[in-house]
């Protein structure tokens, strides 16, 4: 197998048993593919597919004027180039977007001609605002901050059948309902009431009988009954009737007479209930008619109106119950045929017939009026208005759209075969839904499960952006229609008609402030990836936290392989926000799909199919771990399978599909937890959530025990530098890597150079530090997609969120009581958990009423010492160490003249104090912060003179750019001359460049010439002369191109910045703050085992083993059994083995053993004990040595979820490392020197430092701001608030009888306004007395009681 550049340097021992049938797909595909589809950038007019922007335009255009004399048609669109690249946008605080230009065509028709002849056509490109672009990592830069648009899981459009679970009516009767949900437009609900009539609601308004809707659609009573019922036909014969017999319909009835066959044999006796056996006999006997008495039809309902044969008089209306009077009339009139509805109580209820009976309307117009009154109460209905309203509700493509998904779901649910059709409803659709609903009420068919993933679909970025864009376009459409009527008379062009503001505003609003457009979680690479793969049920058109019940939040069988059952937040959002499973993707309709291997007759093939939850329902799906032999035949007698959403067992030949991987069930974060299968789900949930909060440490350290997913996450997250093309490293330093591209990957006519600028010490959204470090050296060969530089929290191209710590599980002096963590001082000394945080502090100089603010080093009443870190422009130097209260940017603000006291006048007269008209508003370092200035940015408004600092920053940026371009040119030039050299050497010259005619060209000759003189050579062969000319032209061309590029960048840098109105200058100062681990910081493992550091002990006091090696962390063993996360113990044991093997390799390297010995030992580790075999024979001796050197800190292991290391393999590894197989050892107490009573579990666990640092939470207040009404101090660190002394704390002081302390708490320390000012003055004067007064909140209480109309006063005597 082929190893990548970084894999060769450090191979992870893989314990998985199952082969990789399929690689984990690109993890950000869901975001990138969706937005690419939306933009269709680079498509020509004929290549546009009917999705995204194109579809939005097509749905709104053509716009036709009210008069119909002019129309505006859409032709196509194109996207421009972004003004700034991503880094510049972040720096300047602008949106990374491209201009959208739409080509439209204005057509003016000739009013005079009858067939709309075209009079004039104008075509023009119109600017339609900016469309934000997605960066290559799936984020958007909006106003300079990186944001992510989270995908939404919402109810798919279509038709759904449900019941109320017996909750509506006290009898517990199930009331069935149907709901047609369009993609946009009015909802249509049908529902049964407790009396079994069917009602309809439109948009959840007042309900009407369902027959009103059917009448409004133009159906008559007879047509309705005809559609829903079959009829019984009776023929009148003398005194009795004869029924046209359909034997099945008699089932369950009691025979009124003996039923006999032709031969007179009694099949059913009178008074007997007719059973299935009787029906079989009747069918065999072939009886066609059955004589029944006249009263047999009493109470039955007529299916058609009964008409007097002679006069045509209606004897009984359609849908009337037959009574004795009506029967008498019928007999008298001589009617020969009566049709009644066939209903029964078992499977054919009279629901629609009953509904028609309670319906007050009798024709289409009345029904339309009734619907109009319900939709628009209080408005007088007219025929036209009622018809228009009804047609617009469900039958107008502008107002109603089922969408392709909705139509597909709708047709499938009501049993049609075709999946395409109109986006609006038709009569037949509504009748079909009603029929299905009645069938379900009759006991045929089942209701839908709305939490099934076949009924919920994912809306991704592209689709949501398209919807917003359409909303904007519809707003534009109204305005354009108004103006189109004037277009002809005033000779307007398309751009005069279209105002792009509403479109731009709609898009901006969506990206800037939609609930699903979120500030990206950028703590570490994992949190970025997880945020982009998140699927939320909240948001516009989705659920709300308060209304979502248990069912929606619960894990559903269809989540398997689509949505992770583990990773979801704790708290009010649990189950509403989910994460995509590792292999899941969406299909063209937005339903989540999971991959499966095809199984044919018990043989597993390598064909892979992606199926949605609907498609997989009928399949029998085996687990990925089902046992197979060499020929891939399933060999178990019974295989554990999933079928019809149930877990069961089947014979191998029944199996049709098989999972592709055991980790396809869980999300990326959960698949990073080793031994996940041994952890309780609740703790695994915490584990996967806490990995996202890990702060990148100063030196990343790969996990000794991983799962093999670390490499995928690091590569796909975009924090590492990945080679775009293969080649040789030409030069590398801390900030850039230059690759000379391999010849076979160079495209003709372009420079074979790739320059990768590394990100150095940049601030992330969470104030953590983003920094990239090169892994490659000059001269190394890299292949495409090799990792060349590590980013934050990555180590040699693998995700590394924490540090491997030597831990012991033991209770120790109560230092680790209740999940506390005891650390060794060595951890702090070695900077294991030291993190760098970067804070951005901003100083804004504005134009005020009294004059402009000024950024300057000349600040009134500030000593020299405070200014020693500022330059002459008043801005702090880069590299300055600053502490709380230090000035970073000096700024003065003009203040109004104040009345001076006589003393001040005297002082000013003596000292000539001039600085009284400005006040000091400098930017200072906030309290509790100490750090180093690492960068300063100055932004100046156009037209304002730039200060020296801004110019020097600009110059250094230009130098950087110039250096880049020169480097590129140097390599291009070098490569070109190398190619020329190989072409020229060995040929004869004709002269030129000081050479004689016929002189042979050798390397020496060429080395003696300057590069510029090579082009003066005249060669004997014309082909070579042509090559020289081409090379010269190419080099000149490249130089010109690079110069143009430089000028363009220079222009961008030198133009003024686009600042908010009234802002003259902005200075941003970046502080790097170093945080060591300290008591109060929160730490965690990967198994949900979290705790707070309680104490940091000296190294010599820590427990140590027989070799004197002290442990780094002491954890409480009581934290394991009750929480059931045993995975951490297995990780500890395997970590010990990994470290032990590393130490063994280290000894071999130090003793300079032969490579063959190393190779043998490595083979024992990788190929003798369980899991996958590694191809060590393909490594050269040097590569084996490099590998061994990198393994000295420990041999990294991978134990993939649900397919990891077994206990026997862990023991074998410990044995190979010469360690006790129990994983326990005898420890000695460092303080007393005594051995502990029993052996202790010691090993290596991967610990994370979470972004809940005590430094950010520490807070103290003396005086500060107060709440307006109650006059009590505000709460919280952000408001510089106080600590609330609550009701229970008051009880505590009351219990101790501490009356004065309590009085102080409730008055002068809180809301006694006069008391606290007096107290402050007293303390300043050194007098520590207090005079408590009336608390302000008591006055508020009195005012509230008075507002209730009670006169209340406080008697003070």
Swiss-Prot record:
<dbReference type="InterPro" id="IPR019462">
    <property type="entry name" value="DNA-dir_RNA_pol_bsu_external_1"/>
</dbReference>
<dbReference type="Pfam" id="PF00562">
    <property type="entry name" value="RNA_pol_Rpb2_6"/>
</dbReference>
<dbReference type="Pfam" id="PF04565">
    <property type="entry name" value="RNA_pol_Rpb2_3"/>
</dbReference>
<dbReference type="InterPro" id="IPR014724">
    <property type="entry name" value="RNA_pol_RPB2_OB-fold"/>
</dbReference>
<dbReference type="InterPro" id="IPR007642">
    <property type="entry name" value="RNA_pol_Rpb2_2"/>
</dbReference>
<dbReference type="InterPro" id="IPR015712">
    <property type="entry name" value="DNA-dir_RNA_pol_su2"/>
</dbReference>
<dbReference type="Pfam" id="PF04560">
    <property type="entry name" value="RNA_pol_Rpb2_7"/>
</dbReference>
<dbReference type="GO" id="GO:0032549">
    <property type="term" value="F:ribonucleoside binding"/>
</dbReference>
<dbReference type="GO" id="GO:0006351">
    <property type="term" value="P:DNA-templated transcription"/>
</dbReference>
<dbReference type="InterPro" id="IPR007121">
    <property type="entry name" value="RNA_pol_bsu_CS"/>
</dbReference>
<dbReference type="InterPro" id="IPR042107">
    <property type="entry name" value="DNA-dir_RNA_pol_bsu_ext_1_sf"/>
</dbReference>
<keyword id="KW-0548">Nucleotidyltransferase</keyword>
<comment type="similarity">
    <text>Belongs to the RNA polymerase beta chain family.</text>
</comment>
<dbReference type="GO" id="GO:0000428">
    <property type="term" value="C:DNA-directed RNA polymerase complex"/>
</dbReference>
<dbReference type="InterPro" id="IPR007645">
    <property type="entry name" value="RNA_pol_Rpb2_3"/>
</dbReference>
<dbReference type="GO" id="GO:0003899">
    <property type="term" value="F:DNA-directed RNA polymerase activity"/>
</dbReference>
<dbReference type="InterPro" id="IPR007644">
    <property type="entry name" value="RNA_pol_bsu_protrusion"/>
</dbReference>
<dbReference type="InterPro" id="IPR037034">
    <property type="entry name" value="RNA_pol_Rpb2_2_sf"/>
</dbReference>
<keyword id="KW-0808">Transferase</keyword>
<dbReference type="InterPro" id="IPR007641">
    <property type="entry name" value="RNA_pol_Rpb2_7"/>
</dbReference>
<dbReference type="Pfam" id="PF10385">
    <property type="entry name" value="RNA_pol_Rpb2_45"/>
</dbReference>
<keyword id="KW-0240">DNA-directed RNA polymerase</keyword>
<keyword id="KW-0804">Transcription</keyword>
<dbReference type="Pfam" id="PF04563">
    <property type="entry name" value="RNA_pol_Rpb2_1"/>
</dbReference>
<comment type="function">
    <text>DNA-dependent RNA polymerase catalyzes the transcription of DNA into RNA using the four ribonucleoside triphosphates as substrates.</text>
</comment>
<comment type="subunit">
    <text>The RNAP catalytic core consists of 2 alpha, 1 beta, 1 beta' and 1 omega subunit. When a sigma factor is associated with the core the holoenzyme is formed, which can initiate transcription.</text>
</comment>
<dbReference type="InterPro" id="IPR037033">
    <property type="entry name" value="DNA-dir_RNAP_su2_hyb_sf"/>
</dbReference>
<dbReference type="InterPro" id="IPR007120">
    <property type="entry name" value="DNA-dir_RNAP_su2_dom"/>
</dbReference>
<dbReference type="GO" id="GO:0003677">
    <property type="term" value="F:DNA binding"/>
</dbReference>
<protein>
    <recommendedName>
        <fullName>DNA-directed RNA polymerase subunit beta</fullName>
        <ecNumber>2.7.7.6</ecNumber>
    </recommendedName>
</protein>
<dbReference type="Pfam" id="PF04561">
    <property type="entry name" value="RNA_pol_Rpb2_2"/>
</dbReference>
<dbReference type="InterPro" id="IPR010243">
    <property type="entry name" value="RNA_pol_bsu_bac"/>
</dbReference>
């Amino acid at each position: 197998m082929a190893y990548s550049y970084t894999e060769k340097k450090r191979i992870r021992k893989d314990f998985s048993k199952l082969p990789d049938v399929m690689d984990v797909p690109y993890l950000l595909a869901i975001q990138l593919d969706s937005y690419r589809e939306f933009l269709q950038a680079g498509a020509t007019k004929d290549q546009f597919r009917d999705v995204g922007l194109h579809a939005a335009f097509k749905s709104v255009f053509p716009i036709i004027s009210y008069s119909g004399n002019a129309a505006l048609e859409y032709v196509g669109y194109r996207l421009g180039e972004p003004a700034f690249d991503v880094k510049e946008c972040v720096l300047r605080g602008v949106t990374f977007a491209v201009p959208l230009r739409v080509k439209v065509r204005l057509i003016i028709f000739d009013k005079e001609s009858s067939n709309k002849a075209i009079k004039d056509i104008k075509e023009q490109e119109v600017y339609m605002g900016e469309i934000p672009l997605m960066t290559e990592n799936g984020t958007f830069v909006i106003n300079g901050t990186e944001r992510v648009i989270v995908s939404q899981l919402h109810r798919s459009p279509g038709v759904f059948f449900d019941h109320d679970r017996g909750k509506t009516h006290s009898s517990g009767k199930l009331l069935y309902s149907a709901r047609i949900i369009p993609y946009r437009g009015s909802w249509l609900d049908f529902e049964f009431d407790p009396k079994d009539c069917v009602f309809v609601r439109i948009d959840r308004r007042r309900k009407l009988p369902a027959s009103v809707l059917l009448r409004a659609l133009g159906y008559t009573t007879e047509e309705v009954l005809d559609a829903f019922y079959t009829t019984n036909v009776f023929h009148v014969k003398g005194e009795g009737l004869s029924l046209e017999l359909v034997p099945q319909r008699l089932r369950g009835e009691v025979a009124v007479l003996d039923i006999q066959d032709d031969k007179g044999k009694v099949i059913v006796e009178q008074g007997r209930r007719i059973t299935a056996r009787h029906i079989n006999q009747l069918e065999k006997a072939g009886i066609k008619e059955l004589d029944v008495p006249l009263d047999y039809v009493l109470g039955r309902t007529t299916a058609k109106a009964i008409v007097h044969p002679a006069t045509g008089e209606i004897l009984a209306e359609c849908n009337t119950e037959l009574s004795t009077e009506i029967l008498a009339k019928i007999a008298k009139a001589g009617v020969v045929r009566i049709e009644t509805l066939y209903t029964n109580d078992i499977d054919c209820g009279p629901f629609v017939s009953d509904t028609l009976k309670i319906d007050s309307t009798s024709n289409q117009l009345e029904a339309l009026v009734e619907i109009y009154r319900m939709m628009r109460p209080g408005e007088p209905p007219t025929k036209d208005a009622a018809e228009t309203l009804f047609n617009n509700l469900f039958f107008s493509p502008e107002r109603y759209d089922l969408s392709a998904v909705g139509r597909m779901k709708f047709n499938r649910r009501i049993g049609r075969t075709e999946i395409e059709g109109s986006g609006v409803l038709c009569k037949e659709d509504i009748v079909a839904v009603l029929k299905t609903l009645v069938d379900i009420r009759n006991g045929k068919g089942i209701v839908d499960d709305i939490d099934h993933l076949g009924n919920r679909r994912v809306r991704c970025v592209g689709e949501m952006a398209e919807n917003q864009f359409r909303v904007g376009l519809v707003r534009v459409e109204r305005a354009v229609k108004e103006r189109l009527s004037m277009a002809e008379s005033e000779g307007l062009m398309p751009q005069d008609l279209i105002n792009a503001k509403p479109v731009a505003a709609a898009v901006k609003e969506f990206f800037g402030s939609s609930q699903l457009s979120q500030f990206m979680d950028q703590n570490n690479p994992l949190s970025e990836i997880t945020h982009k793969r998140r699927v939320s049920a909240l948001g516009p058109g989705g659920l709300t936290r308060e209304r979502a019940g248990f069912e929606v939040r619960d894990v559903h069988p269809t989540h398997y392989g689509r949505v992770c059952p583990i990773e979801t937040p704790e708290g009010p959002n649990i189950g509403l926000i989910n994460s995509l499973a590792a292999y899941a993707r969406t299909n063209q309709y937005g339903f989540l799909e999971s991959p499966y291997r095809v199984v044919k007759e018990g043989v597993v093939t390598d064909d892979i199919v992606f199926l949605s939850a609907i498609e997989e329902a009928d399949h029998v799906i085996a687990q990925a771990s089902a046992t197979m032999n060499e020929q891939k035949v399933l060999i178990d007698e019974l295989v554990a399978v999933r079928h019809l959403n149930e877990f069961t067992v089947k014979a191998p030949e029944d199996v049709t599909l098989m999972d592709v991987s055991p980790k396809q069930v869980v999300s990326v974060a959960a698949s990073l937890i080793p031994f996940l299968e041994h952890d309780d789900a609740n703790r695994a949930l915490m584990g996967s959530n806490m990995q996202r909060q890990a702060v990148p440490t100063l030196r990343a350290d790969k996990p000794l025990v991983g799962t093999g997913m670390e490499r995928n996450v690091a590569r796909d997250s975009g924090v590492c530098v990945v080679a775009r093309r293969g080649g040789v490293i030409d030069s590398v330093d801390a900030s850039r890597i230059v690759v000379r591209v391999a010849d076979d990957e160079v495209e003709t006519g372009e420079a074979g150079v790739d320059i990768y600028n590394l990100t150095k010490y940049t601030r992330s959204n969470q104030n953590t530090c983003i920094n990239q470090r090169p892994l490659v050296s000059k001269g190394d060969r890299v292949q495409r997609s090799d990792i060349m530089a590590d980013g934050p929290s990555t180590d040699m191209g693998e995700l590394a969120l924490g540090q491997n710590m030597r831990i012991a599980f033991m209770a120790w002096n109560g230092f680790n009581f209740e999940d506390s963590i005891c650390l060794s001082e060595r951890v702090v000394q070695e900077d294991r958990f030291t993190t760098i945080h970067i804070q951005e502090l901003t100083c804004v100089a504005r134009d005020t009423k009294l004059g402009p603010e000024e950024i300057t080093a000349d600040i009134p009443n500030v000593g020299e010492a405070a200014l020693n870190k500022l330059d002459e422009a008043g801005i702090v130097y880069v590299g300055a160490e600053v502490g709380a209260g230090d000035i970073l940017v000096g700024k003065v603000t003009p203040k109004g003249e104040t009345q001076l006291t006589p003393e001040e006048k005297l002082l000013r007269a003596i000292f000539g104090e001039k600085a009284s008209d400005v006040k000091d508003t400098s930017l200072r370092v906030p309290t509790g912060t100490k750090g180093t200035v690492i960068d300063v940015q100055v932004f100046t408004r156009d037209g304002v003179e730039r200060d020296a600092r801004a110019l020097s920053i600009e110059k250094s940026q230009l130098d950087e750019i110039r250096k880049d371009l020169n480097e590129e040119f140097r390599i291009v030039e070098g490569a070109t001359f190398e190619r020329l050299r190989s072409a020229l050497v060995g040929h004869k010259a004709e002269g030129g460049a000081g050479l004689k005619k016929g002189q042979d060209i050798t390397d020496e000759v060429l080395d003696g010439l300057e590069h510029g003189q090579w082009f003066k050579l005249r060669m004997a062969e014309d082909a070579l002369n042509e090559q020289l000319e081409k090379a010269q032209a190419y080099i000149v061309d490249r130089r010109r191109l690079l110069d143009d590029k430089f000028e363009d960048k220079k222009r961008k840098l030198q133009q003024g910045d686009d600042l908010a109105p009234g802002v003259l200058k902005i200075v941003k100062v970046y502080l790097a703050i170093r945080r060591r681990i300290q008591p109060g910081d929160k730490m965690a493992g990967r198994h949900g085992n979290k705790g707070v550091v309680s104490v940091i002990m000296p190294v010599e006091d820590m427990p140590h083993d027989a070799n004197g090696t002290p442990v780094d962390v002491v954890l409480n063993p009581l934290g394991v059994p009750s929480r059931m996360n045993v995975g951490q113990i297995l990780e500890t044991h395997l970590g010990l083995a990994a470290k032990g093997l590393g130490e063994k390799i280290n000894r071999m390297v130090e003793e300079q053993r032969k490579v063959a010995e190393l190779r043998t030992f490595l083979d024992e580790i990788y190929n003798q004990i369980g899991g996958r075999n590694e191809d060590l024979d393909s490594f050269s001796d040097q590569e084996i040595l490099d590998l061994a050197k990198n393994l000295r800190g420990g041999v990294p292991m991978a134990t993939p979820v649900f397919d990891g290391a077994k206990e026997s393999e862990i023991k074998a590894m410990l044995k190979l490392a010469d360690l006790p197989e129990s994983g326990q050892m005898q420890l000695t107490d460092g303080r007393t020197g005594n051995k502990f009573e029993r052996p202790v579990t010691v090993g290596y666990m991967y610990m994370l430092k979470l972004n809940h640092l005590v430094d950010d939470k520490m807070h103290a207040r003396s005086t500060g701001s107060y709440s307006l009404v109650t006059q009590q101090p505000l709460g919280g660190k952000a408001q510089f608030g106080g600590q609330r002394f609550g009701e229970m704390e008051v009880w505590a002081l009351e219990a101790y009888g501490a009356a004065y302390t309590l009085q102080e708490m409730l008055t002068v320390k809180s809301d006694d306004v006069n008391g606290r000012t007096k107290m402050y003055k007293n303390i300043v004067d050194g007098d520590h007395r207090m005079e408590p007064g009336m608390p302000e909140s008591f006055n508020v209480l009195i005012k509230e009681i008075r507002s209730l109309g009670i006169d209340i006063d406080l008697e003070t005597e």
